[in-house]
Amino acid sequence: MTTGAPVEDKQRHIILDALRGFALLGICLANYPEFSLYSFLENYPKELFPTAGIDKITQWFLYIFIDGKFYTIFSILFGIGFSIILENNRKRGANGKVIFYRRMIFLFLIGLAHLILIWSGDILMLYALVGMLLPLFLNCKDRTLLIWASTFLAIPVLIDYICQFTGVYLSSKLVEWQWLLCDRFGITEENFAYWLRDAHTYSDMGKFLLMGAVERMQEFVDGNRYFKVLGLFLIGFWIGRNRFFTDLESSGGILRKIAVYGLSIGLPLSAIYAWSAMDSKPFGFGTHSLFYFISVYITSFGYIACFCLLYLKYRKAKFWQLMAYPGRMALTNYIGQSCIGVFIFYGVGLGMGADTGLIYGELIAITVFVFQIGFSSGWLQYFRFGPLEWIWRCLTYLKVFPLMRFHEKS
């Protein structure tokens, strides 16, 4: 039996890397309201910003076009990557499952470090834990796979309605732990939004991160995120197993239908979801969850289809390569967005958090992503992998791969 190896440059599919870069842009836009601490502010201080009017428009934009859509795309791409790993290692005679589980273990450790040391909004840990379930579906037929995926995506709506009508919430214990930590560290409702801005030592920042880690677990439970992520992983696995991304031309008709129906139905429903979110969920948590279920996934599929159609029509444009650069270094850039956000907005850095309107936070997010395009492009001129990608691959395959490109000629 041979040891597997990561995907080489010549084996990569630029559409997947470009889609991953596109997803990173959306994730950056979705996360920076939290990095800037704007999301933690009460309504009154938000209304005092000179940008309050455009901030409200920006919030509507985020709910309609961004919220949930790009983590959905990122999760689907993760499932596609799982299928590619298994297929490549099967061809080499390697044990794909062992390699995959090892890969997930190290992703979990990277995510855990990200969660408790940098930013409490980490998603990697959940990806790793849920990802470990994917091999259980390896032998499922395509139809069975899609049934499971649809079921997992729909379960959160049922759970939310049950919680709404019974008044019993699964995260109640986590909420207790969260407030116990707040009491212990002196984090109050009054200073909650300003704590990270005013924490000028890493030890003070670490107190909030510890409390934030518990809050993140609460968010996963309240949002039933584990079911959603597993369902999206399975859809990605189905797409990857059928190799749809290798022959987009023959799928043009299907892609056009998905694009038309996905956007014409998904975006209006996303507007209803945005109204529900902006108006404190007037129809209750369950109905808000239903709006999310219908709007976010349909719109996300529409985004993917539109992206692929544009690629087919303008595939010689430089845009695709520009988006592919950060996509090839997705792990490095995802954590890099956190490091930059901490430096700009937290007290251990420039301390700009909670002092700027939402629109400024989003403009900073766009600037960060543009920087990452340039950084990734420059890095990949000299190196085969991103820095964290290289470490992750070496740990996964238990061997040291050449990092610099001059090794390819030797």
PLM segments and residue spans:
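Specific transmembrane alpha-helix
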Residues: 72-87, 125-138, 224-247, 295-314
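Functional transmembrane helices that form membrane-embedded active or gating regions
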Residues: 8, 12-23, 258-259, 311-340, ...
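Membrane-proximal soluble regions of multi-pass membrane proteins
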Residues: 57, 381-410
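Long hydrophobic alpha-helical segments that form multi-pass transmembrane helix bundles
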Residues: 151-231, 235
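Solvent-exposed interhelical
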Residues: 97, 135-148, 238-260
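N-terminal signal-anchor module of multipass membrane proteins
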Residues: 2-78, 85
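Alpha-helical transmembrane segments of multi-pass integral membrane proteins
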Residues: 281-381
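Internal alpha-helical transmembrane segments
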Residues: 84, 88, 92-163
